[in-house]
Amino acid sequence: MCKSRTMFLAAFALCVVAAIAVRVDAQQSAPAQKDSIAFQDHVNAAKLLAADDLTGRNLLDCTMPPQSAAPTGKPVTAPPTRVFDQLYYLGTDIVASWALVTSAGIIQIDSLDNPEEAQRIIIGGYKELGLDPSQMKYLVLTHGHDDHYGGAKYLQDTYHPHVLMSTPDWDMLAKLHDSRPGFGPPPTRDMDIADGQKLTLGNTTLTFYLTPGHTPGTISFLVPVTDKGKPHLLSFWGGSALPRTLEPGAFEARATDMGLLIYKRSLERFIKIGEDGGADGFIANHPYRDQTFIDGKNDKITKNRMREPGDPSPWIGRSTYIRYMMIALECNEAQIGWIQAGKPQVSQ
């Protein structure tokens, strides 16, 4: 990508984000109205923001109706990888988990699909990376879907971390009767997360924000890390897949969706939180979203392994982070506009 185009995209993204505060004030309290911009214009904006490096599965959110961004087929296990000085990736090409090492123990983020994956990929990864599973003090679950909590009961019963999830999603899981084949049961309810709540372990503090949309109580947060001693702040958006309807619970196949309108308000709020906090990178709980692990050839784990001294981390880049978040917002706007327009047939 030419330098001038990169500079234009960065400037464009910054200008759009600067307008978020105004949009939030105007839209959070306003009734749903038909978008004044045609939904296809939002799709085009997302494609522009994607440029050459954020194309692919993230843009599937902009298809009408939206397609699943998840890869199909048997999951491929990623090599356990030290991503930053204190952050480690443990997952597959479909779902992620992260270990955040502090001066007083480990904060584990998400737990994969089931006990077998948690034991083989998370605990096996700990041991391969020289981490001690007994130092897992907290297990943070980004939301109450089984591809994120499926291994939690095993970790809870075996290593006894405190398990944290938002109050709305704990309540949602309390109504769950049966586990899906291939996925583990919910953990025993332990600690509830409220909006703005802080978790401090040793020298690390995370502040959690309730960002309903993907589920009633999806949480998002900023992760402080260092790369070879240099500090960075990563944005972690906790629920990437878009709802299918405007209002909560209207799509039977995904009854936990809170609707596109609520999702949009949460996303706008968290973008502003990231901007105010100075986020300069991002990670996700699905690796095809942040391109942490795709195929072992053209992903960030591979690029990180091939870094030369002085090269920046592939997870860091303020412009890229902003464009990633704005693609999600544009696709959300496109889906709202498409539904409000009566779901017309669209050539993809």
Identify the role of each PLM range.
Residues 21-28:
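Boundary at the C-terminal end of the N-terminal hydrophobic targeting segment
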Residues 28-73, 228-231, 242-348:
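Accessory terminal helices/loops
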Residues 73-129, 221-247:
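Conserved beta-strand hairpin/beta-sheet module of binuclear metal-dependent hydrolase folds
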Residues 1-5:
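N-terminal secretory signal peptides that target proteins for export/translocation
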Residues 32-37, 42, 48, 116-120, ...:
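Active-site HxH/HxHxD metal-binding segment of metal-dependent hydrolases
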Residues 63, 67, 82-83, 120, ...:
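Metallo-beta-lactamase
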Residues 10-19:
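Bacterial N-terminal signal peptides
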Residues 116, 144-150, 170-173, 216-219, ...:
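Active-site environment of divalent metal-dependent phosphoester hydrolases
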